[in-house]
Structures are given as C-alpha cells and as structure tokens.
Regions:
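Non-catalytic structural scaffold of enzyme domains
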Residues: 2-280
C-alpha cells in the first residue's frame, strides 16, 4: 500500500480516519464535504464494536492496532473519529512521536465550543463518554469560566441505527434526557457522539430558539482543514478525492447503515480480517 507522492507544494497522500463502528462515517461525510480534493481511508473495526464497554487498556490497544493498519497506507494525518478512543486512548498515544499529525473528535469539539465565545455548554454523549468526563475536563481546562453540563443519552445510538431520526418516538426520547435543557437552556449544545449529527434537525426543532448546536463530525472536519493548511499538507487544487472504507466485519445491516451515515454511495468498501488489524 504505497504512499502517493508528495509534489513540491502539495501532498496527495490520504487522510486516515477510524472508529470502532459506523458512527465515524458522519466524520467522513463532513470531511468529504469540507475537503473534496482529499483522499480518505476509513477503518471501521466493526468486529469489535463497541469499544465503550472495554477497559481503557484494551481501548488503547485497539486504537494502536487501528493506527498501525492505517499507517500502511502512508497517511499524512489521522483523526480518531471515535469518542471512546479520543477519551480513553488518545491522551497516552499523543504523548509519543508520530510521523503524521494525529487528532480526535474531543479536541475538535472543544475548539469549536471555544470559537463561539459562549459560556453555557451542554454536552450530549453516550454513557461511557459522559462517565469518562473527557469533554467536561477538556472544556474546563481550556476555559475555567465555562459552565458545563454533561448528559448521557444511551438510547440515541440504537434509535438512530434503526433509522428513526424524527417523529413522536424521538420527541419522547428527547423529553427523557433533555427536558432540563428546556427549563434552563444552554447557549451551546455539543453533540459528543458521531452518531448524533443525524439527530441535528430534530434537535434544532426541540431546543429553545437561539441554541447553537455543534456536532463533533463537523468540528473534526474543520479541525482537519486547519491542520492540513498549517502543516502544508493540502492536496493539489482541482483534484477529486476518493474514499475507501475498510471494515473488519460486514454485518447484515452494514450497507443500510452506511448509506444513512454517508448520504451517498461513494467509495469502495473492502472487507478485511480482524487478523489484518491485530497483526499490524
């Protein structure tokens, strides 16, 4: 899997994105929209999904294996499109030197919040992400003046994966977790799970008018765009980027979910064996 050549002023090597499952495909979609000239390699470790119920040590091991697999493609940058990895594994991994810049959705989300200048923030996430305190700690470390509420929304992911993103059922689930936001509205709501952007239209209708909704997928794309420019790693202008999707287990509902997350059928889906990851 040789790297594509770097020209004098541009770098056409691919970007690597990875997640434990398919939620990270919302990040791929955002990156493809923001950076259409960039090639993207996505790894979905669907054979071991979810990472959220694993120990931090196991999550870090899996993340290192995922990165080692992507590194075979000669990637020029990588983003952990997985909140569990960003919370539990990335802090240790980032302490080491890498041949390419590496980031995650939590850092990107925090930067997006800070850029708004608003102080009252609500973070929505899975039970594991919220329990880790990763977003809250990162936000308060960046600006201690922020007022942060973290809300676990464990039913969001299974409902989204069933294809239900609006209607009475969704409203009932919002009432279950988010009624407090109607009584005491935040200025910013950060969607701290890569599945949650599919709820964004419904959330816009549910939350008080004027509430700014930020999603980690769009934030990751913005972060990556700035990173490539700062490091001089942008692809040649005018080229059409390509996407390749690697999965360790093509489940029966994979194509259906992939279409929902990507809003398009672009790119090639390639099945790989879990051994290809473990032995990377």
């Amino acid at each position: 899997m040789p790297a594509k050549r770097r020209t004098k002023n541009y770098d056409n090597r691919p970007i690597g994105l990875f997640d434990s499952g398919l939620g990270g495909l919302t990040v791929v979609r955002a990156v493809r929209e923001a950076l259409p000239g960039e090639d993207v390699i996505y790894l979905g470790d669907t054979a071991r999904v979810p990472y959220g119920n694993r120990s931090p040590e196991t999550v870090e091991l899996f993340a290192r294996q995922d990165l080692a697999f992507l590194e075979k493609f000669g990637i020029k940058a990588a983003v952990a499109a997985c909140n569990t990895v960003s919370a539990l594994a990335l802090p240790n991994i980032l302490r080491e030197k890498h041949s390419f810049p590496l980031g995650g959705v939590i850092l990107a989300g925090v930067e997006a919040v800070l850029a708004t200048g608003r102080r009252k923030v609500a973070v929505l996430g899975t039970r594991g992400t919220i329990a880790s305190g990763a977003y809250e700690h990162a936000l308060l470390a960046a600006d201690p003046r922020l007022i942060v509420r973290s809300i676990a929304c464990p039913l969001f992911v299974p409902v989204i994966e069933e294809g239900v993103t609006n209607g009475a059922i969704v409203r009932e689930i919002f009432d279950l977790y988010l009624a407090q936001l109607l009584r005491d509205p935040p200025e910013v709501v950060l969607l701290g799970c890569t599945h949650y952007p599919l709820f964004r239209p419904a959330l816009s209708q549910y939350l008080p008018k004027g509430t700014l909704i930020l999603d980690s997928a769009a934030a990751a794309a913005d972060y990556l765009s700035r990173l490539l420019k700062e490091k001089g790693l942008c692809a040649e202008p005018g080229r059409n980027g390509r996407a390749q999707y690697y999965v360790t287990d093509r489940t029966p509902g994979f194509e259906r979910l992939a279409r929902r997350f990507l809003d398009a059928g672009d790119g090639e889906v390639i099945d790989i064996h879990l051994a290809d990851i473990v032995n990377s």
